[in-house]
Amino acid sequence: VLYAIIPVILDGVERKLKAALQSRIGPPVTQTIYDLLKLVLVKEIKTQPTILYVYLSLTSSIVTGLASLYYITLYALRGDQVDMFYALALFAITTSTHTVTPLIVPNPYSFIGGIREVVLGVVNEAALITSISLYTIMAQRSMLKSTQWVIIIAVALVALTAFIASYVASSRVPFDIAEAEPEVASGIFVEFSGSVLALNIYSLLLRRLIVKLLVLAPTVGLLYGFSLTGLLVVLLLLPATWVTYATVAVILGRSRVDVAPLTLAKIYITLILISITVLLVQAYV
């Protein structure tokens, strides 16, 4: 229940923060809750059969997302790599389902936006899964406790890759290439309104929560170990991480559709190859 409420509250905090950074008064922290309730109460305009598939797709995305959060919690408590790999697999399903949903909407603008998301997702999800898997293995072996600078560099590079990939997965500027940022949750569903938009917005917010916990859990595990205390530290760091991502989004400018995926691919390949090379050299020296 806590995980179901947190993303809605933190999104309200993010909107308030953005308004403050842009010298605006902004909406109340509870505005996102009001928006979702308002959309749920709005009567659907479209009666196309497609809307049923959209409902099923978004609902399955939310359910698998909540299941992913369950395994992340187990990982933070026990430190079992299998739990994190389950969480990554479920998150990949969540992201894939959410990403391909616009492709079944009978509207060219929605389809184009969906294709852009697919292209970006192909690049980013591979880096996210690879970096967090490496990060999890390092956390399991407590490699950060080593005083060897080579190990510290490798851990830092993997952590940097994981945090970059998690930021991109949150669909914030400049990686909101499907639509302009205010329309990330609604533009690709231009033909629908009401509860469909509410489900899509909530699915997006849930993904933003998951990607932050995916990188925070192994980070805290490296520093504090895996226990109930570690889980509490993760939850305490969550609002700060969310605010940091929101601040970065305000500072950064937009990117071209053809530039963002290619640039990300170059960055990810470079960082991951260097970190793996460093670890291999350390293992055989």
Where are these regions (language model features)?
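Alpha-helical transmembrane segments of multi-pass membrane proteins predominantly involved
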Residues: 1-285
